[in-house]
A protein has these predicted regions:
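Conserved P-loop/Walker A NTP-binding site and adjacent catalytic elements of P-loop NTPases
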Residues: 1-199
Length: 199
């Protein structure tokens, strides 16, 4: 889908819906459910901020309907994350962790990181076209397999890109060559206004 079309929020919707339903039903536990991986630290910070508004809107609607409050917590974990925030994540894991491929690897190598990530259900890899074809992609593919082994369940894996072709190859990268997956391609084609002028 094209840039600015809401791919990232759409990717989060099912996971957020599950968290809200669980929260209403019996309250949310302090467990990480979603890991969002971005190739850029700046994008990670933007995503966390961009999630705050929809989550606040959901909480306001729950209050209006007289339903229990569901406080979905998000935190960024990159190389720039202050030690105080890292300690906070260890004490009380966020429901959504926003990170980079390198920081995901580091989390998977520490006991506290593995404990936090063991409850993961969904992984969202944004701007996958920027990661897949290089060493970072190979590194991330290994981290995704390690995360799935740690979680002990099939993870929902979502890859997002505005430009990736062929999509099938990226699907294999994200899920493994033999895994079943669904590819959603909006088929967006930009209109072109071309003219040929001969002198």
């Amino acid at each position: 889908a094209p840039t600015g079309s809401g791919k990232t929020l759409a990717a989060f919707l099912a996971a957020i819906d599950t968290l809200v339903c669980e929260g209403i039903e019996h309250g949310l536990t302090d467990e990480t459910h979603v890991v969002y991986v971005s190739p850029l630290k700046a994008l990670s910070n933007d995503i966390q901020k961009n999630l705050e508004l929809p989550i606040a809107g959901i909480r306001a609607e729950l209050e209006r309907l007289g339903l229990p409050d569901v406080d979905i917590r998000t935190m960024v974990r990159t190389g720039d994350t202050p030690q105080a925030d890292r300690a906070s994540m260890r004490r009380r894991p966020p429901h959504i962790v926003v990170t980079t491929p390198e920081s995901l690897y580091i989390l998977l190598t520490s006991a506290s990181g593995r404990k936090m990530l063991a409850t993961t259900r969904t992984v969202i890899v944004d701007e996958i076209h920027a990661i897949a074809p290089n060493k970072r992609g190979a590194h991330l593919a290994l981290s995704l397999e390690r995360l799935q082994a740690l979680a002990g369940r099939e993870l929902v894996r979502i890859g997002l890109s505005a430009t990736q072709k062929p999509i099938g190859e990226i699907a294999k990268f994200l899920t493994g060559a033999d895994a079943q997956c669904t590819i959603v391609d909006t088929g967006h084609i930009r209109e072109r206004d071309l003219a040929i002028e001969l002198p």
